[in-house]
C-alpha cells in the first residue's frame, strides 16, 4: 500500500512539473508596434499601439489592468488615439473618461523640481478572460526638448508577442546609427518625402524570463539601440557641457569646508563622497524624463537632493575643486556599436579618481565601489575626456579568513584575521574593520539534548550570503555573477575536556568546469580543523554551464557547512 501511495505522489509531482513547463502564458500581444519619429524641425513623436489578449485572472486583475505613460506636459503632448476592450463575444467597451487618471510619477515623489511631470494611468475596463485590450497613443515632444533621437529598448515583453513592429524615421540627411542584437532580423529601409524609415518586423517573440539576475548586459537578451547624434562623443559632450567647472566659487567654498582638517587625499575623498551620498537626497527621476538636462549645483545646494546625473556633477566638481583630479564616465547597459549608444543606454554614471595611489570607482548614490567596477562586459566611456573608452582593471575578488575558535561550555570565542580585497570594502565609514583586519566575536552556547552547535564566522560579503546560492535547477539565459569569486576560510577550533566533536570528519570536493568547492573537517587532538574554499573560473556563465555552477553555489550556500556539532558529556 505504501508503494502505491509513493508512486501516486510521484505521479502528481511529475504532472505538476509538466504543467508548469508547458503552462500557457498569462496573456499574448497579438500586435505590438513602436514608431520613433524625428522631424526636420527637431520635434519628436513616439507612436505606440498594442493589442493584448488576456488568458488568466492574474493578467486581468493585476498584471495588465492598467497602462502607464510618463511625460512632461510642459514640453510634451499626449494624445490617446484609441483605448477600448474587445470582449470575447465581440462586444466593444470603450475606456471612459474617468479611467484616464493623471498622477505624479513615483520617481518624482520626493523631488519638487520635477513635480510637473505626469504619469497617465490608463485603467482598462470591461476585462474578462479572452478579452483583448486595444491601446493606441502618440507622445509628441516640442523641438529642442529631446536633443536627438535616442533609443534603448529591450524587446521582450512580460508576455509573448505574435507580431512586433519597430520603426525609426529621421530626415534623410540625418545620421542614424542603430544596433539590433540577439535576434535574427534584417530591417527594411525606405525613403519618402525627405524622411528615411528603418523598419523591423519580428514574429513570435517569447515572454521575458522571470528568473533572477537576467540582464541585457549578460549578452543574450534582444535589444535595440539607436541614435542620431553625430557620435557617442557628441552625446556625452552634450551632457558633460552642463557640468559645473571646478573653478566655480560656490563649489570651491563647499569643498574647502568639507575637507578642512583632513590630512591627505584619502580623507578628503571620504568626506566629499560621504557628503554627496548621505547628505544630498537621491531622486530617481531618469535622465530621459528630465529631458537629458540637469539642474545647477546651486539648485542642488538649496534643495538638498538630486538625480543621479546631478549628484554625479556635484561629486565630480567637489573632488576636482579639492585638488583631487576626477574623471566622470558612463557605464552602458549593453555592448553595442558605440555610434548607436546615446544617453538612454547609460546604466550608471561613475566618478573615477586616485587618492594616495588607490583607485576609486564611485557612484554618487553608494559608499561602495560602483557596479561598473565589477562588470567588464559592457563599455565604460569618459565624459571628461571626450568619449574616450575607460579601461577598468578586473577587481581582485579574494577573501581569506584565518579563524581561531576557543570553545567553553558557555560560549565560543572567535579571533578572526581577515584579508578581504579592497573592491569589497566600503570607501568610508567606521565599519571598514568589520570587513577586513582583526576582529573578535563571541557566541553563547546552550546545550540541547546533550549537544551544542558552534557557528563558524565568515565574511559578510561572501557569495554564500547571496541569492546566487539559491537558484532554480535550470536556466535559459546567461548568468553574470557579481565577481569571479575566490574565497578561503581556515578554522582551528579548540574543544575543551568534556566536549567532543560530533560532526563526522569528512572531506568533500566538488570540482567541475565552473570551478571548485572544498569542505573539510578533521580532528587533530583537542583541535578540529575546518577548511572551506570556493574558486570560480569566470564571471559569466552560459545556460550549458549553469548546472555545474549551481552545484558549486548550492553547496557553498549550505549553512550546515558552517556549523559544528559538539557533544557534551
Give the residues covered by each predicted segment.
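Positively charged n-region of N-terminal signal peptides that target proteins for export
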Residues: 1-7
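Bacterial N-terminal signal peptides
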Residues: 9-20
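A sensor for short, sequence-defined functional sites
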Residues: 24-569
Amino acid at each position: 500500500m505504501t508503494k502505491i501511495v509513493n508512486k501516486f505522489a510521484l505521479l502528481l509531482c511529475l504532472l505538476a512539473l509538466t504543467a508548469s513547463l508547458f503552462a500557457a502564458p498569462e496573456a499574448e500581444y497579438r500586435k505590438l508596434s513602436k514608431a520613433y519619429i524625428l522631424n526636420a524641425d527637431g520635434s519628436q513623436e513616439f507612436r505606440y499601439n498594442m493589442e493584448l489578449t488576456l488568458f488568466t485572472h492574474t493578467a486581468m486583475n493585476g498584471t495588465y489592468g492598467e497602462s502607464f505613460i510618463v511625460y512632461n506636459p510642459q514640453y510634451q503632448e499626449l494624445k490617446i488615439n484609441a483605448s477600448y476592450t474587445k470582449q470575447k463575444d465581440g462586444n466593444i467597451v470603450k475606456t471612459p473618461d474617468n479611467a484616464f487618471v493623471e498622477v505624479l510619477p513615483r520617481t518624482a515623489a520626493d523631488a519638487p523640481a520635477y513635480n510637473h511631470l505626469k504619469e497617465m494611468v490608463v485603467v482598462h475596463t470591461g476585462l474578462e478572460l479572452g478579452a483583448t485590450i486595444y491601446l493606441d497613443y502618440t507622445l509628441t515632444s516640442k523641438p529642442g526638448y529631446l536633443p536627438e533621437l535616442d533609443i534603448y529598448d529591450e524587446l521582450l515583453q512580460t508576455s509573448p508577442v505574435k507580431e512586433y513592429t519597430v520603426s525609426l524615421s529621421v530626415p534623410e540627411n540625418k545620421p542614424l546609427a542603430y544596433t539590433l542584437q540577439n535576434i535574427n532580423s534584417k530591417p527594411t529601409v525606405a525613403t519618402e518625402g525627405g524622411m528615411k524609415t528603418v523598419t523591423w518586423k519580428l514574429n513570435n517573440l517569447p515572454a521575458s524570463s522571470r528568473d533572477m539576475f537576467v540582464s541585457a548586459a549578460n549578452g543574450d537578451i534582444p535589444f535595440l539601440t539607436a541614435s542620431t547624434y553625430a557620435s557617442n562623443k557628441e552625446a556625452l559632450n552634450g551632457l558633460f557641457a552642463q557640468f559645473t567647472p571646478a573653478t566655480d566659487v560656490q563649489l570651491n567654498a563647499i569643498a574647502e569646508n568639507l575637507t578642512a582638517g583632513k590630512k591627505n587625499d584619502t580623507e578628503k575623498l571620504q568626506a566629499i563622497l560621504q557628503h554627496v551620498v548621505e547628505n544630498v537626497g537621491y531622486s530617481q527621476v531618469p535622465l530621459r524624463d528630465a529631458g537629458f538636462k540637469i539642474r545647477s549645483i546651486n539648485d542642488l545646494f538649496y534643495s538638498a537632493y538630486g538625480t543621479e546625473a546631478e549628484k554625479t556633477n556635484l561629486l565630480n566638481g567637489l573632488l576636482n575643486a579639492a585638488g583631487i583630479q576626477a574623471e566622470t564616465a558612463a557605464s552602458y547597459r549593453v555592448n553595442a556599436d558605440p555610434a548607436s549608444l546615446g544617453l538612454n543606454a547609460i546604466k550608471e554614471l561613475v566618478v573615477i579618481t586616485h587618492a594616495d595611489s588607490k583607485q576609486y570607482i564611485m557612484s554618487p548614490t553608494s559608499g561602495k565601489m560602483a557596479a561598473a567596477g565589477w562588470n567588464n562586459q559592457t563599455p565604460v566611456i569618459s565624459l571628461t575626456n571626450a568619449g574616450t573608452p575607460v579601461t577598468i582593471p578586473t577587481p581582485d575578488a579574494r577573501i581569506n579568513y584565518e579563524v581561531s575558535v576557543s570553545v567553553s561550555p558557555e560560549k565560543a570565542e572567535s579571533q578572526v584575521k581577515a584579508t578581504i580585497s579592497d573592491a569589497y570594502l566600503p570607501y568610508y565609514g567606521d565599519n571598514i574593520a568589520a570587513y577586513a583586519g582583526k576582529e573578535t566575536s563571541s557566541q553563547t552556547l546552550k546545550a540541547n539534548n546533550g549537544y551544542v552547535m558552534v557557528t563558524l564566522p565568515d565574511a559578510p560579503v561572501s557569495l554564500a550570503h547571496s541569492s546566487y546560492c539559491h537558484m532554480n535547477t535550470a536556466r535559459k539565459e546567461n548568468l553574470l555573477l557579481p565577481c569571479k569569486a575566490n574565497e578561503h576560510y581556515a578554522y582551528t577550533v579548540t574543544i575543551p575536556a568534556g566536549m567532543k566533536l560530533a560532526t563526522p570528519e569528512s572531506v568533500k570536493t566538488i570540482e567541475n568546469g565552473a570551478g571548485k568547492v572544498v569542505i573539510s573537517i578533521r580532528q587533530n587532538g583537542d583541535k578540529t580543523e575546518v577548511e572551506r574554499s570556493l574558486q570560480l573560473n569566470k564571471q559569466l556563465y552560459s545556460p550549458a554551464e549553469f548546472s555545474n555552477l549551481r552545484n558549486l553555489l548550492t553547496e557553498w550556500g549550505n549553512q550546515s557547512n558552517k556549523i559544528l556539532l559538539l557533544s557534551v558529556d
